[in-house]
């Protein structure tokens, strides 16, 4: 098992760099707008923002192919946008409107898209991990070469069902990538206060699952690690663990004042390690884009996000009859 530090790959072309920049910026601006709408009362219930962690899902989606699947926890808006789900439908679902992906009944934590192979959004910590293995088992049974990206956090990594899943996935050599989004805090509990193993990916060793730590504030490093993990799974070698070390700028949820860390800590990460600023710098210094080019992209992204907010506001609330549909248990 190895640990990977941030790297700036010179063989990445302009189109790829611009794609990463656009995708990460869309997630950042979308989440900022969602936070605003929550404050205005348009979005209710739980709302967990992905601000700061954008490079994780954008880098891994760049490693995915058509037909690959993804499943995650409650901090899921970024994953939806990164796999190509419509911002209008995502924002409308956040607002509990009929135009949302789950007809306004799922909200922030419980929407999905079969068309994009996005299987949720799950509110129970760690519960999505065995489901991800199940998705991978279906692909192995069908004898295709699809891969499932199963995302969970450093807090969920302490849940028992995760290790039951590791054992089964290794035993059956399932094509599943276990993605540990280590943002340093499980709600308000620092990782160092909740685990005696600072490198969570090493826990796979007992199940003969290879893995590595990745700089999650560098989208190029994430893409490189994602390519390696995907190749491993498609070759029929079984599961792979990526512990992607990242950082969330906002609280655990909109109701979290985040008093367990200092403002200076957050500001230091923003100033020195921000993934979007990192790619922006590469684009400019490498002459892949000009300041005007990036301003044009920023303007385009803001327009998309503002339109998603207006769509959500204009979309009606679900009809009363929807209370009785889509019930299976």
Model-derived features with residue positions:
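Glycine-rich ThDP/TPP pyrophosphate-binding loop and its adjacent helix/strand module
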Residues: 117-314
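Short acidic, gly/pro-rich beta-turn/loop elements at beta-sheet edges
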Residues: 80-82, 188, 252, 322
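A general secondary-structure junction signal
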Residues: 74, 244-246, 327
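Conserved acidic/glycine
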Residues: 1-56, 254-329
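Alpha-helix boundary/capping residues
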Residues: 24, 41, 63, 94, ...
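Cofactor-binding active-site loop characterized by glycine-rich and histidine/acidic residues
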Residues: 32-35, 40-172, 193-196, 201, ...
């Amino acid at each position: 098992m190895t640990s990977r530090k941030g790297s700036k790959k010179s063989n990445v072309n302009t189109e790829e760099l611009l794609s990463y920049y656009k995708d990460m910026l869309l997630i950042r601006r979308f989440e900022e707008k969602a936070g605003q709408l929550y404050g205005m009362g348009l979005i209710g219930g739980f709302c967990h923002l992905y601000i700061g962690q954008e490079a994780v899902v954008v880098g891994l989606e760049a490693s995915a192919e058509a037909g690959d699947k993804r499943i995650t926890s409650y901090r899921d808006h970024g994953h939806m946008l990164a796999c190509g789900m419509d911002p209008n439908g995502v924002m409308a679902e956040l607002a509990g409107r009929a135009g949302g992906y789950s007809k306004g009944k799922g909200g922030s934590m419980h929407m999905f898209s079969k068309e994009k192979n996005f299987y949720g959004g799950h509110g129970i910590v760690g519960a999505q991990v065995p489901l991800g293995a199940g998705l991978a088992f279906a692909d192995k049974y069908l004898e295709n070469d699809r891969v499932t990206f199963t995302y969970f956090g450093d807090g969920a990594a302490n849940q028992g069902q995760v290790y039951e899943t590791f054992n089964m996935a290794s035993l059956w050599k399932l094509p599943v990538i276990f993605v540990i989004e280590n943002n340093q805090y499980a709600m308000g509990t620092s990782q160092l206060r909740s685990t005696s193993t600072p490198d969570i990916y090493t826990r796979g060793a007992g199940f003969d699952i290879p893995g590595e730590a990745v700089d999650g504030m560098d989208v190029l490093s994430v893409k490189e690690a994602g390519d390696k993990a995907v190749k491993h799974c498609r070759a029929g070698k079984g599961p792979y663990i990526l512990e992607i070390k990242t950082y969330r700028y906002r609280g655990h949820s909109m109701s979290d004042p985040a008093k367990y860390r200092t403002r200076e800590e957050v500001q230091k990460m923003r100033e020195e390690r921000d993934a979007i600023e990192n790619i922006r710098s590469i684009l400019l210094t490498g002459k892949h884009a000009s300041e005007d080019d990036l301003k044009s992209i920023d303007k385009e992204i803001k327009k998309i996000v503002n339109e998603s907010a207006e769509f959500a506001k204009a979309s009606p609330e679900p009809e009363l009859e929807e209370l009785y549909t889509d019930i299976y248990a």
